[in-house]
Regions:
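Membrane-embedded alpha-helical segments of multi-pass membrane proteins
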Residues: 14, 29-46, 66, 86-95, ...
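Membrane-interface helix caps and helix-loop-helix hairpins in membrane proteins
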Residues: 22-29, 74-83, 102-106, 155-158
Length: 180
């Protein structure tokens, strides 16, 4: 593949990631968003280097920044660069990028479906684990019962995460396959 083709391919992938991140600004059901799909797609097509992490995570961060400061902010709210527990959420995105980089070296429908399910599971497990000790005042006891209660409390949101990851993964990967 020529240098020009690689540049065009990267530009298309980046454009699709930015477009998917911008879709978060459209009202949606809880957790029915493209964030897992963005991380998976970036991991699959941006190679195993810093771009695979930086581009999807920055696109998600910029959409979070806009949502938190322009859409969800109430009058008098302080300007927010991040939110409580952000490192758990963004850590899960980094793990999803890794999943995409390794699972989707060669893209297939089955691998995209498996990757999407894996992305949902990673986000659910990591973000809820971060909620367990991270609430002030504490909501969950600092033992296995508290952790299990935290995961049980997160189950209603898993459906939106799973559907969003699946729908947006299929959309991103299928669109890219048609363009490519």
């Amino acid at each position: 593949m020529s240098r020009k083709q690689i540049y065009i391919q990267s530009a298309v992938v980046i454009f699709m990631i930015v477009l998917a991140a911008a879709s978060r600004l459209i009202p949606h059901t809880y957790n029915l968003t493209p964030v897992g799909a963005i991380a998976l797609f970036g991991g699959a097509y941006l190679g195993r280097n810093w771009k695979a992490f930086l581009i999807p995570i920055m696109a998600i961060y910029l959409s979070d920044f806009i949502l938190n400061n322009l859409i969800y902010a109430q009058p008098g709210d302080a300007f927010a660069y991040a939110y409580d527990g952000w490192y758990w959420v963004y850590g899960s995105y980094a793990l999803i990028v890794l999943l995409g980089a390794f699972l989707l070296k060669k893209v297939s429908v089955l691998k995209v479906v498996a990757g999407s399910l894996g992305a949902s599971a990673i986000f659910f497990l990591v973000s809820n684990f971060g909620c367990w000790p991270g609430t002030v005042p504490p909501v969950y006891t600092p033992d296995m019962n508290g952790l299990m209660q935290c995961y049980i409390s997160g189950l209603p949101f898993f459906k939106g995460t799973f559907v969003g990851d699946m729908v947006f993964s299929v959309a991103l990967f299928a669109t890219y396959a048609l363009i490519h």
